């Protein structure tokens, strides 16, 4: 399988995102700011490339909005990336579309999250760091926990 490049954007002009996608510089755009349905529809008119919308899960309304997002995939997180904080994952029992799970994941938590909620993918940053740097042992333990529980 080919490794796909993902550009992460926070409130970037849709024209800029589309230009990078259409030129083949990136394969997928992850929208991690306040991009709403109108923004995504506008971006859709400029490109047909895959879009991931990051949604901060703060309450039932934020999850309901994620459910109807026009993005191809949803990344559910507790806040701005890299905080290491989880949201109340039990709300995922009622979420019916493909999603990436982020926030509060680490080698000790990802296995149970994958086994119970079956996300399409998981996203991790600070959960595999030691003293602010990626830790190879934590990365290996994280991947092993996902593989063990992804059945």
What are these regions, as identified by a protein language model?
Residues 1-21, 27-37, 52:
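Structural motif corresponding to the early beta-alpha repeats
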Residues 19, 23, 34-126, 130-131, ...:
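Short loop-to-alpha-helix "cap/lid" segments that border enzyme active sites
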């Amino acid at each position: 399988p080919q490794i796909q490049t993902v550009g992460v954007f926070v409130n970037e002009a849709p024209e800029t995102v589309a230009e990078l996608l259409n030129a083949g510089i990136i394969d997928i755009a992850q929208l991690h700011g306040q991009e709403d349905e109108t923004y995504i529809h506008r971006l859709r008119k400029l490109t047909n490339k895959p879009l991931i919308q990051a949604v901060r899960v703060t309450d039932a309304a934020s999850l309901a909005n994620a459910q109807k997002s026009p993005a191809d995939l949803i990344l559910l997180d507790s806040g701005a990336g890299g905080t290491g904080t989880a949201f109340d994952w039990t709300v995922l029992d009622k979420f019916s579309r493909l999603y990436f799970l982020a926030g509060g994941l680490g080698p000790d938590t990802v296995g149970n999250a994958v086994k119970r909620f079956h996300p399409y993918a998981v996203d991790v940053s600070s959960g595999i760091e030691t003293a602010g740097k990626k830790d190879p042992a934590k990365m290996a333990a994280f991947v092993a926990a996902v593989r063990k529980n992804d059945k």
